[in-house]
Amino acid sequence: MTITEHPDHLTRPGSAPTGHPGGHPGGHPGHSPLVREIKHDLNNKPFIVIWEVTRACALVCQHCRAEAQHHAAPGQLTNAQGHELIDQLTSYERPYPMLILTGGDCFERPDLVDLIEYAVSKGLHVSISPSVTPLFTRDRVRAVQEAGVSMMSMSLDGGSATTHDAFRGFPGTFDHTVEACHMLRELGMKFQLNTVFTAKNIHEAPQMLKNAIDLGAMMFYTFMLVPTGRGAQLDMLSPLEREDVLYWLHDNSTRIATVSYTHLRAHETLR
């Protein structure tokens, strides 16, 4: 389920997240969320292409499927190869796939602005998903904004600094992410906040949604833990916790976008 990029989804006057998963959440919102409609055959053309431009990242996130490291991996695509990849995406019929540049930390890539400018010049819609590290500066944000990025995503994996910082591996990351959200709003850059639900942070789900609303996020995306990379060492939700989460997501479905929740439709029916 993917909510349309609409600024009111998380800032609707009078809206508030319902209670803790497992309690007695509020009633059905009364209408279905808007969705971005896919009108082409996904067997012939991807809808979104997510390119991990580097494995380099200063953080050591517990769930990282890429097992990011402090330096680029051997075999990372060169700038010329990156241009070739972008050219391949424009070989499809319009509308072209959306391109998301991530990592690792995409800000670790020295030619990030060039890749964005080239993709935009070819008619691609480009978003980025950087890590919030000392590389996340106003100058870099302005540079990617001027290159053509109009949307970015960041991660907020806890309702509190204690939980988020433990998840990301560095103290102060929560506060820096909050500051980054304020910076993006000042610069007029739309952003979404992502979170991965695990047994360690699910108790803070309502607070994470509230934080996303208060910080002015355009969307709040939730993911279930995929036990791969460093994430293989984390505890997944129990069956009962997963069921509670699905009901909670359903009751907040006008404000939350979900990824890989294959049983959510069944819970919509049961609701």
List each model region and its residues.
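A short, flexible beta-alpha/helix-coil linker loop
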Residues: 68-71, 159-161, 227-230
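Conserved alpha-helical substructure of the radical SAM core
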Residues: 2-13, 17, 25-147, 240
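Single conserved hydrophobic/aromatic residue that forms the stacking wall/gate
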Residues: 263-271
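Radical SAM/AdoMet-radical enzyme domain recognition
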Residues: 79-101, 109-226
